[in-house]
């Protein structure tokens, strides 16, 4: 790699970091929970088609980032990238597949460029209310902590899964807040996808392999 190519690569890397940071800032600006808006209890990042993390937002908590990086592979096991469509967004708060306890929700959204899936955006945030015994550490079993959602589509081809949201709303004390938090996770992934498309067009990239 010659000096000019190194400079070009560094420019693309800095731009990719700004993409995921804007993803995280979108989550903060649109979240309903104060744990996200004020405490920054979140993570955001971009992954290659194999589910390997390429970049993470500076904003967020290390615990979320590490568990989110591992959880994307579980999403791909259930929903391979080749089966995902533009406009999809998948969701879970399974503590064994995602971030450790039911209050942390993780979403995964495929990123498309020129009609092909080129990567994935994922985000995690702490949702204050998931039902169960309520706030605090009183639960002795995971079933007492609240609603456990397996990896399911929150949005499919741009259409919201209202059946899933109806189940969530029926099991929490703050349905409007929780639904807003789930939509904020989807929104920040969408912003990441949009910014990635702009970046790939600007640098004339067909995929993320070279940058990865």
Features from the language model and the residues they span:
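Extended, highly charged
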Residues: 1-31, 50-54, 58-60, 64, ...
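N-terminal leader/propeptide and maturation segments of large enzyme subunits in energy/redox metabolism
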Residues: 2-11, 148-212
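Short, basic/aromatic recognition patches
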Residues: 15-39, 76-80, 91-98
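Gly/Pro-rich turn-and-neighbor structural signature
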Residues: 33, 42-92, 200-212
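Short, small/polar residue-rich loop motifs at catalytic or cofactor-binding pockets
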Residues: 38-41, 103-105
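Short, Lys/Arg- and Gly-enriched loop/turn segments at beta-strand edges
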Residues: 98-104, 130-131
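A short, hydrophobic, proline-anchored segment that marks a local hinge/packing element in signaling
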Residues: 104-114, 122
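Gly/Pro-rich active-site capping loops and adjacent beta-alpha segments
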Residues: 117-171
